[in-house]
């Protein structure tokens, strides 16, 4: 019974050795390779006659990570006993001459004959995922900081600068009525007009930065305010349809929806050459979907209008931060549909 179990274990180990993606190499005490599985041949090929080369692994190794350096040959793992039976990161050159990171283990398995096993697992995909997660985390922090600063400046403009200017306007009107001088009255009238225009411009800038209604009342209120201002400033009619009414969502989701729609509307204004844009926001309780539709010029996704590329890329980046997705459907002379969907 024991023999049968041993044979079964031997067969299992043999199957693992032959089929695993883990690269397994056996070397003697001189550093000559005496055996390796097929997976290891991505790095060490039989044509190179590595079984006759002393310290064969060194010829493909680009260093390992230690406590001092990311890539180093100092205190080589082939010579030190400190790394025995422990995992470490090593950089190996593949047969295609690409340098890739691996999680490695180098351990003596037969002291009497001086045989050691060197195993490698490719960690490039994990590192790429970690880098992407880190980039997304940094992007999230950057956008959050940007939105917070927009909010601060917007409120400062609305609560402080505009109020001060309104006070100046009141003082100017009082001055005009106190002194009945014709020239003074005409000058005051002109200054009032300039001041009124400046107040409107600052109000618009405040809303562009970040409307207070987005934080206080939600998406629908923010859009109604923004679209009204947009129509007054640019003469572009926006047809808005929504079923979200007073519904509130996570602050980050509301910000993404607002910014993506804002970018889509502004792109349509600049490039579509239309008089009307259709915007819709709907939710079924499981997701929120926003659409920006124009019946204008359209464009090729491979050759989008100059200046719009960063905006389209920014839409997708923002959407990814809340596990959302942006789809752009466009046809020359038929228009563009930008669809954002976010799970909630």
From Swiss-Prot:
Cofactor: [4Fe-4S] cluster
Keyword Metal-binding in annotation: yes
Keyword Kinase listed: yes
Top-rank EC class of the record's enzyme: transferase
Pfam families: HATPase_c, HisKA_3
Domain Histidine kinase: 147-344
Protein name, per record: Oxygen sensor histidine kinase NreB
Organism listed in the record: Staphylococcus epidermidis (strain ATCC 35984 / DSM 28319 / BCRC 17069 / CCUG 31568 / BM 3577 / RP62A)
């Amino acid at each position: 019974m024991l023999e049968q179990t041993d044979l079964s274990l031997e067969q299992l180990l043999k199957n693992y050795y032959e089929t695993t993606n883990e690269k397994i190499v056996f070397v003697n005490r001189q550093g000559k390779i005496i055996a390796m599985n097929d997976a290891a041949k991505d790095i060490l090929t039989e044509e190179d006659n590595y079984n006759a080369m002393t310290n064969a692994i060194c010829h493909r190794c680009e260093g390992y990570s230690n406590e001092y350096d990311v890539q180093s040959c100092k205190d080589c793992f082939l010579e030190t006993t400190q790394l025995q039976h422990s995992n470490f990161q090593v950089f190996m050159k593949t047969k295609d001459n690409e340098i890739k990171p691996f999680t490695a283990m180098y351990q003596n398995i037969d002291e009497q004959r001086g045989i050691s096993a060197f195993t490698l697992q490719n960690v490039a995909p994990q590192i790429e995922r970690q880098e992407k997660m880190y980039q997304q985390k940094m992007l999230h922090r950057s956008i959050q900081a940007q939105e917070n600063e927009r909010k601060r400046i917007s409120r400062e403009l609305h609560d402080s600068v505009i109020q001060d200017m309104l006070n100046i306007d009141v003082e100017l009107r009082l001055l005009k009525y106190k002194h009945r001088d014709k020239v003074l009255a005409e000058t005051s009238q002109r200054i009032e007009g300039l001041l009124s225009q400046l107040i409107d411009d600052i109000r618009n800038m405040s809303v562009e930065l970040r409307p207070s209604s987005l934080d206080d009342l939600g998406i629908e209120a923010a859009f109604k305010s923004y679209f009204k201002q947009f129509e007054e400033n640019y003469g572009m009619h926006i047809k808005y349809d929504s079923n979200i009414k007073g519904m509130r969502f996570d602050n980050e989701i509301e910000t993404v929806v607002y910014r993506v729609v804002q970018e889509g509307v502004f792109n349509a204004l600049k490039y579509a050459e239309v008089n009307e844009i259709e915007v819709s926001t709907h939710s079924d309780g499981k997701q929120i979907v926003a659409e920006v539709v124009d019946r204008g010029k359209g464009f090729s996704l491979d050759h989008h209008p100059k200046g719009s590329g960063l905006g389209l890329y920014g839409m997708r980046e923002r959407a990814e931060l809340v596990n959302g997705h942006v789809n752009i459907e466009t046809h020359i002379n038929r228009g563009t549909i930008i669809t954002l969907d976010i799970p909630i």
